């Protein structure tokens, strides 16, 4: 079966069980799939995980500047609940660049904006990116040289600012770990060196997710 037709859990289980990767895994469909009751993922560049709570939605990552709007549209087709909290897993633009679309959605609805939470290293990363704006655009175009500007991945000449002007700055940061409660849901944020040195992984201890 074509991987585009597989449920994300089915696709990941297939790879884990077989140990064989023979089809695309990191899909950019802009489509939302409910993983469990109240838990969903929008597969994009990058993905956005969404958890429903009694106080609103908790979103993990905002996707990129070219895909954030599509992510919000898919989210809104699934739920009209306000976004309570937006967590950045790290400061790369494909994970934070779509935050402007989330705040535009809030403005249209006339509700309070979400709280943005991230590791403390995200703020100096943004500052560094802004100071080296032209350089970052150049090296990313070289690194991803096979991607044409019209592919709209934010890596070509169509982008004026490496950090989009409407990117939301973190409202709350942490250093090693942070316990967060939204509604009746508990979220444990932990710092780890992953793709970056400002990486966060999120754990729901009650549901082991």
Residues covered by each model-derived region:
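Short, solvent-exposed loop/turn and secondary-structure capping segments
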Residues: 42, 54, 98-99, 126-131
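Metallo-beta-lactamase
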Residues: 124-191, 206
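Active-site glycine- and acidic-residue-rich loops that bind
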Residues: 190-199
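Active-site metal-binding motif and surrounding structural segment of the metallo-beta-lactamase
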Residues: 25, 32, 55, 66-117, ...
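N-terminal pre-domain segments of enzymes
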Residues: 1-29
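Short catalytic-loop micro-motif centered on adjacent basic/acidic residues
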Residues: 58-61, 85-87, 189
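Active-site environment of divalent metal-dependent phosphoester hydrolases
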Residues: 91-97, 123-125, 196-197
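Conserved beta-strand hairpin/beta-sheet module of binuclear metal-dependent hydrolase folds
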Residues: 26-80, 201-209
């Amino acid at each position: 079966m074509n991987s585009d037709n597989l449920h994300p859990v089915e696709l990941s289980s297939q790879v884990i069980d077989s140990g064989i990767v023979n089809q695309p895994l990191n899909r950019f469909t802009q489509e939302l799939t409910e993983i469990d009751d109240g838990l969903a993922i929008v597969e994009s560049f990058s993905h956005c995980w969404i958890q429903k709570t009694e106080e609103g939605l908790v979103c993990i990552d905002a996707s990129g500047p070219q895909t954030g709007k599509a992510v919000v549209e898919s989210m809104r087709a699934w739920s009209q609940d306000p976004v309570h909290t937006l967590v950045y897993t790290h400061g790369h633009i494909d994970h934070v660049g779509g935050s402007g679309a989330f705040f535009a959605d809030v403005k249209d609805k006339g509700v309070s904006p979400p709280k943005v939470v991230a590791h403390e290293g995200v703020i100096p990363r943004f500052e560094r990116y802004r100071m080296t704006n032209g350089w970052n655009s150049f090296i990313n175009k070289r690194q991803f040289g096979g991607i044409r500007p019209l592919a709209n991945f934010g890596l070509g000449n169509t982008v004026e600012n490496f950090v989009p002007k409407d990117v939301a700055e973190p409202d709350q940061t942490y250093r090693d770990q942070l316990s967060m409660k939204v509604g009746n849901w508990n979220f444990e944020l932990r710092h780890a060196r992953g793709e970056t040195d400002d990486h966060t992984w999120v754990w729901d201890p009650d549901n082991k997710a």
